[in-house]
Amino acid sequence: MANSGLWELITIGSAVRNVAKSYLKAEASSITAKQLYDASKITSSKRSTSDLHVQLLEKYRNGKVKHASQIKELGLSSKDTKRTLLGNSLDVQKDASGVKHLQEQSSKEIKNPISQPILPNKKDEISPAKPSAIDSSIKDVTKSHPATNANFTADFESSIEESYSTENKSPVILSSSKVPSSQWSRLWHYGGLATSLSVGAIGEKMKRMWGISKDDGALLLNERNVEILVNKLTQMRGAALKMGQMLSFQDSKLIDPRVSQILERVRDGAHSMPEKQLEQVMVKNLGKNWMTHYSEFDRKPMAAASIGQVHRARLASNHMEVVVKVQYPGVMSSIDSDLNNLAYLLKASRILPKGLFLENSLAAARKELKWECDYEREAAFAERFGSLLKNDSDFKVPMVFREASGPSVITLEYLHGIALGKQKYSQATRNHIGYLLTKQCLREISEYHFMQTDPNWSNFLYNGKTKKIELLDFGASIEYDEKFIKKYCRLLLAAAHRNREKCKKLSVELGYLNNHESAQMIDAHINSIFTLAEPFAFDAPDVYDFGDQTITARVKQQIPVMLDLRLQPPPEETYSLHRRLSGHFLLCAKLGAKVRCKELFSGMLKHYAD
């Protein structure tokens, strides 16, 4: 049966199921305008009907309800309490209060698991700790891959800045749900999602006709559908959630605000898998006696992201504190089908702007996702970085424990540093950190020819005792062709010397331009490169103040022109390379670092000069 036929079958089946559920929930037999509107409310699970449930959940997640006595004061039974606390956002929302709560919840940030201390447990198991943010190794919140680029610097977009919050916020309570692991089950979920969104759009249209809704936005992106889409993507995990996280780093001005809202929330949330599935993954990778590798293992994850979750543990062999990344079952095998189904939804909805080259973005995402799902590949890159920085006085890379790792499980050394932005530093320390990060970024491009391309700054810890920067998450590491790197470095040098003709020539050789673009497009492209190279320019100040930089804002001004006028997508390398570069600039800006960029740049790239 053709894929389109499967979509039709699943869509029809889901429509019958959802409409029937809505019809049975009607409280009166007569059909009124309000009931027609209610019939379009499709939910993935039962909703709480009590204001007390909403009140309890909000208080619980804010840390105000901790004991049974407090719960009883709210007048709820233990059954009600369990249902309320374990329910997801849709379960307890009222049209207004639920949206408000979800928005508050999506903005929360939690500590990096690799920087959390491990506490021994009398029962030979690590005591459950408050959930903390996934180390950047799986923060795929963390992983922040833009799916598309406007042109040379289309990754410099405002939403990246929003992911680098420096506030210490309350921990998020992870919801647990089974990961749909087979292709058929995932296809069924996508079909149900498509139907729910369609019925929701019809319902929204009827509400507007009857004057019930004052919303004037896109029908498909009504408030109800936003909740459905966020809930489904966080439940599905895998490529669906990953793609949402990638798209979340596109400029919010170029995408419908409600799409941006959806993407921001799926970037910051995911469900953890039940313990039964955790056991299955561990057995598959390390054997039935997998627990013999650990003297302690916390079965409750510290955090969950798009392709896996993180657990704290201690090795049995040497009692070292470690973190264990466990991949969701079926994520690797479902990448192709997930992205195909997601592309179907994106094309059908027409919610993405012209110029994003969806097919190219999906192709890049497909390749990178498969790399990131290969934990053995990640282990190899971690060891490679570790070897290069083994004797470095400024950087540390976690050890990989191969005996406790597999294709979808990786055990890494626990690091004691704190994620950048989690604490305040003196100006001198911020300058030092900015200098080291700039040096490492340029070193990866010009010397290593491979980079860790995840821009999330939770991947960079600072250890106040050792004064070292600790590097995490090598799943997004990519090696670049030497010919590409040579021309790319020459392009950066030309931009630093403000040579427009040479920039244009090298841009054509690299594939950013094809000599048929309009003068307006060429100017926008070259101006964006000049802006990118500003900290390294020959006429730049010796010490560049990132705290005052406006690079991001000025490059953003060129993006609409490039999206509208470009004739071809940028080189494939751009998607990952500029993700790292843009992330580095924003990281230094958040630190407010003052760095001798020009000196570093000229010294490290001088052998690429003509």
UniProtKB/Swiss-Prot annotation:
Q: What is its main location?
A: mitochondrion
One term under GO cellular component: extrinsic component of mitochondrial inner membrane
* Superkingdom of this protein's organism: Eukaryota
Q: In which pathway does it act?
A: Cofactor biosynthesis; ubiquinone biosynthesis
Q: Where in the cell is it found?
A: Mitochondrion
- EC annotation? 2.7.-.-
Recorded protein name is: Atypical kinase COQ8, mitochondrial
* Biological source species: Schizosaccharomyces pombe (strain 972 / ATCC 24843) (Fission yeast)
Q: Tell me the gene name.
A: coq8
